[in-house]
From Swiss-Prot:
Transmembrane segments: none annotated. The active site is at 65 (cysteine persulfide intermediate). Residues 17-105 form the Rhodanese domain. GO terms for cellular component: cytoplasm. GO terms for molecular function: thiosulfate-cyanide sulfurtransferase activity. It is found in: Cytoplasm. This is Thiosulfate sulfurtransferase GlpE. It catalyses: thiosulfate + hydrogen cyanide = thiocyanate + sulfite + 2 H(+); thiosulfate + [thioredoxin]-dithiol = [thioredoxin]-disulfide + hydrogen sulfide + sulfite + 2 H(+). Pfam families: Rhodanese (PF00581). Belongs to the GlpE family. Transferase that catalyzes the transfer of sulfur from thiosulfate to thiophilic acceptors such as cyanide or dithiols. May function in a CysM-independent thiosulfate assimilation pathway by catalyzing the conversion of thiosulfate to sulfite, which can then be used for L-cysteine biosynthesis. Keywords: Cytoplasm, Transferase. GO terms for biological process: glycerol metabolic process.
Length: 106
């Protein structure tokens, strides 16, 4: 069975900046609304079908949560759905924010 990979926030930012990957955030709606990584798609049970229709299965997908734990399960789920290159962002949004990477806030 295929497995997801791990990526640090700097590597994730580099892929996103070059337009080579799609970032999804699986945190709760309130946390996402307060602040999220720039250009992140809020992936929920309600938005997964829409996401799967919009994104090519060959396009790398980066999964972000709070601290890099929950994202691993979601990343494996996306692999199981047929996405070919899926990464769990180590450290999650907390590490992204600590690294002063681009954030969209309300």
């Amino acid at each position: 069975m295929e497995q997801f990979k791990h990526i640090d926030v700097q590597g994730a930012h580099a892929l996103i900046s070059r337009g080579e990957a799609r970032l999804v955030d699986i945190r709760d709606p309130q946390s996402f609304a307060v602040a999220h990584a720039q250009s992140a798609f809020h992936l929920t049970n309600d938005s997964i079908v829409n996401f799967m229709q919009q994104v090519e299965f060959e396009q790398p997908v980066l999964v972000m949560c709070y601290h890099g734990i929950s994202s691993q399960g979601a990343a494996q789920y996306l692999v199981n759905q047929g996405f070919e290159e899926v990464y769990s962002v180590d450290g999650g949004f907390e590490a992204w924010h600590r690294a002063s990477l681009p954030v969209e806030a309300s």
